[in-house]
From Swiss-Prot:
Protein function: Plays a role in the inhibition of the host innate immune response. Mechanistically, promotes the autophagy-mediated lysosomal degradation of host TBK1 and affects IRF3 nuclear translocation to block type I IFN production.
Species of origin: African swine fever virus (isolate Tick/South Africa/Pretoriuskop Pr4/1996)
Family: Belongs to the asfivirus A137R family.
Name the UniProt record assigns to this protein: Structural protein A137R
Keyword NAD: no
Organism phylogeny: Viruses, Varidnaviria, Bamfordvirae, Nucleocytoviricota, Pokkesviricetes
Length: 137
């Protein structure tokens, strides 16, 4: 999966944050119900030891997410929220590309299946600093 990221304005970002607050649990439930497995398939949490936010997926989610529209939408909304950018799908590879290139901000975000997001203060302000790696655990 590849996506193009363009900057969100403040109103769009607030609307997305409101949506994300309301939709987080519901989205997880939809994914879990779709996969018909009673255990939780994804978790979003702050790791106090590494000081990073983590988005964790199980192997079942890993194999299903590209084929399940709810899984794709969940990941896109998550990336929109934490990056403060619009995300537009461009193909089947798992690479996200920033449209605006600034010094200190990476042009590519490699995505697998455990998100370790650096510097939450900057992310909450809509600045993507460092790299988001999602790795299968």
């Amino acid at each position: 999966m590849e996506a193009v990221l363009t900057k969100l304005d403040q109103e769009e970002k607030r609307a997305l944050q409101d949506f994300h607050r309301c939709a987080w649990e519901e989205t997880k439930n939809v994914i879990n119900d779709f996969l018909e497995i009673p255990e939780e398939r994804c978790t979003y949490k702050f790791n106090p030891y590494t000081k990073k936010m983590e988005l964790l997926f199980t192997p079942e989610f890993h194999t299903a997410w590209q084929e399940v529209p709810e899984c794709r939408e969940f990941i896109l909304n998550f990336l929109r929220l934490i990056s403060g950018h619009r995300v537009v799908l461009k193909g089947p590879t798992i690479v996200f590309t920033k449209e605006i290139k600034n010094l200190g901000i990476p042009s590519t975000i490699n995505v697998d299946f455990q998100a370790n997001i650096e510097n939450m203060d900057d992310l909450q302000k809509g600045n993507l600093i460092g790299k988001m790696n999602i790795k299968e655990s």
